A protein has these predicted regions:
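Polytopic transmembrane helical bundles with strong interfacial aromatic enrichment
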Residues: 1-149
Length: 149
């Protein structure tokens, strides 16, 4: 273990730290996407609570592995990955399918619009927290202190 502002962080090699970082971003996307696609995704309160729990647990796990500064950046990167995935894997493909069905003269599947709206709404509400976490690197008051966890 090495010491930083928070106390102790995991003694990881560069390769291990990169693996944890990239792996957790992918795992975070798949977990978030899974929650949204299951029946849980239809219950806004339950989905919100579970997504919040994923963020909090991820923040805690990151803070045990990395410095507090890096932990905030990693949580921000994880949520930003969700937002990017929403755009490239849900919103844009669904929009293309709706446009294609309209061009063929068919009625579009309303489920495609509902899925895109759900993810677009999530992106709207996740924007400010992601900005805060990404900018936190420039403001030590956000990651230095006695009461981090």
């Amino acid at each position: 273990m090495t010491v930083n502002q928070k106390g102790k962080v995991a003694d990881l090699s560069v390769t291990q730290a990169i693996g944890v970082s990239l792996g957790s971003l992918a795992l975070g996307w798949f977990l978030y996407d899974f929650l949204c696609k299951t029946p849980i995704g239809k219950n806004l309160v339950l989905l919100g609570l579970l997504v919040y729990a994923v963020v909090v647990l991820s923040a805690y796990a990151y803070s045990e592995l990395f410095s507090s500064r890096a932990a905030l950046l990693h949580v921000g990167a994880m949520v930003a990955t969700w937002m990017t995935g929403n755009v490239f894997f849900i919103i844009i493909p669904n929009q293309k399918k709706v446009v294609a069905s309209l061009q063929r003269g068919e009625a579009p599947d309303p489920l495609l619009g509902q899925q895109a709206k759900q993810r677009s709404t999530h992106n709207n509400y996740l924007t400010l927290p992601v900005l805060f976490m990404m900018l936190s690197n420039h403001y030590p008051m956000t990651f230095v202190g006695d009461d981090l966890w």
